[in-house]
Regions:
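N-terminal targeting or regulatory segments adjacent to alpha/beta-hydrolase or S9 domains
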Residues: 20-100, 108, 379
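Glycine-rich active-site/cofactor-binding loop and its immediate structural neighborhood
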Residues: 91-152
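Cap/lid segment of the alpha/beta-hydrolase catalytic domain
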Residues: 128, 134-227, 234-235, 280-285
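Mobile cap/lid helix-loop segments that gate and shape the active-site cleft of serine hydrolases
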Residues: 205-206, 210-214, 228, 266-307, ...
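Alpha/beta-hydrolase fold nucleophile elbow
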Residues: 238-250
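Glycine-rich nucleophile elbow surrounding the catalytic serine of serine-hydrolase chemistry
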Residues: 248-258
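Short beta-strand/loop motif that positions the catalytic acidic residue
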Residues: 309, 316-318
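C-terminal catalytic histidine-bearing segment of alpha/beta-hydrolase fold enzymes
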Residues: 335-379
Length: 379
């Protein structure tokens, strides 16, 4: 007993010499009373906050229905009832790679043509269906071309490959069929002009303002476009509709998160450099204006968004030097998602990985997760 006491005292004295652990630094700082005001008004009612004691299936159903309403997607469904999307297939172009590349388009609402690349492995056969990768881009006006490896010039090629950003081309080499679509308000082909620079000369913000006036959001428009592509893909003879993977970086990751939360046809989701809470504890809002869903904090937060993906597969990927996001906030969210997935009965179907650089794709983190998830589906 005496020995134990001596050892305890020694340990206490030793700890006195250890440097104090620093508390995580705030992501930003607001002056008072602004800081308190922001955190107070942004707290929200959290009406669909996850509760482990609730029935998981019922919680998901009600939370998903409310999210569809909140984004304005329900409004779009009403406004566009009876409209039939039309797909136009372009001329297939052979590449020096192991796949063909075809620039196509889909009319998702009257007069709105969404261009997309369709990548098909050259060895694809009608006797065997292949998994699909749907990969919408973020704030890159050449985004669909970047992801599909359809480079405009050498400078574009070097920029994309320097960050391993040709994620669609990578997937096609791995035997995936790929749909790399333009993202509304972000692709050069689908920008909303800001003629008088009233919206800061930012096309994505102009899109937000116009959408809000019509009872929808850019998120709703973008999810709508992805769903119409999924409708078409499900009927494609070469696509295995039970093995659909979705990914995108930055704004493309935000779109991946919302689409997967709303549409259960996505089996594996990898939102890159995007999946985080709505705001930091100081009140800083992490995502671009165009990702805004009004009253989202009255609904819940991104942990609930991730909870709508469960028990399907969800990998969060971030870069350690990405200045747009806050590691302590992301790490906390990762732990919260583990608990939600545990409640769904699939604790191992979500993970958080950190890449060693900034705001970009991390294929070395993504592909092992995808392969493992799809292998499970085949068992």
């Amino acid at each position: 007993m005496r020995v134990r006491i001596i050892l305890f005292i020694a340990a206490v004295h030793f700890c006195d010499f250890l440097p104090a652990q620093e508390a995580p630094k705030p992501f930003v700082e607001y002056p008072e009373p602004i800081g308190s005001y922001l955190t107070r008004i942004q707290k929200g009612a959290q009406e669909h906050a996850f509760n482990a004691s609730s029935n998981f299936v019922k919680w998901q159903k009600h939370a998903r229905e409310a999210l569809i309403e909140l984004t304005g997607l329900k409004q779009m469904e009403k406004d566009l009832a009876g409209f039939k999307p039309k797909v136009t297939i372009g001329e297939s172009k052979k590449t020096e790679d192991s796949f063909t590349r075809t620039l196509c388009s889909i009319e998702t609402e009257p007069g709105i043509q969404i261009p997309f690349y369709l990548l098909l492995p050259k060895n694809a056969k009608k006797t065997r269906t292949l998994p699909l990768l749907l990969c919408p881009h973020g704030h890159d006006t050449l985004g669909l071309h970047s992801y599909a490896g359809a480079f405009k010039d050498e400078k574009h090629r070097q920029k994309v490959l320097g960050k391993e950003g040709d994620i669609g081309a990578q997937a096609a080499r791995r035997g995936f069929i790929v749909i790399a679509p333009a993202t509304r308000g972000l692709a050069q082909e689908l920008l909303i002009p800001d003629p008088k620079k009233r919206h800061g000369n930012r096309p994505c913000r102009a899109q937000l303002i116009h959408c809000l006036l019509g009872g929808r959001t850019p998120t709703a428009e973008r999810v709508w476009d992805m769903q119409r592509l999924l409708d078409w893909a499900e009927k494609h003879p070469l696509i295995d509709s039970k093995r659909i993977v979705m990914t995108g970086n930055s704004g493309g990751g935000v779109l991946t998160a919302y689409t997967t939360a709303i549409d259960s046809r996505i089996k594996v989701a990898i939102p890159s450099c995007s999946f985080t809470s709505v705001m930091s504890k100081e009140g800083f809002i992490f995502h671009c204006d165009c990702c805004l869903v009004p009253k989202l904090r009255n609904w819940g937060d991104w942990k609930e968004l991730g909870g709508l993906v469960a028990p399907r597969h969800l990998l969060l990927v971030h870069g350690v030097s990405d200045g747009l996001h806050h590691r302590p906030t992301v790490d906390k969210l990762g732990r919260q998602l583990k608990n939600i997935f545990k409640a769904s009965g699939a604790p191992n179907n979500t993970a958080l990985e950190w890449g060693n650089s900034g705001h970009r794709f991390y294929p070395d983190k993504m592909w092992p997760f995808i392969e493992k998830a799809l292998a499970k589906k085949e068992e």
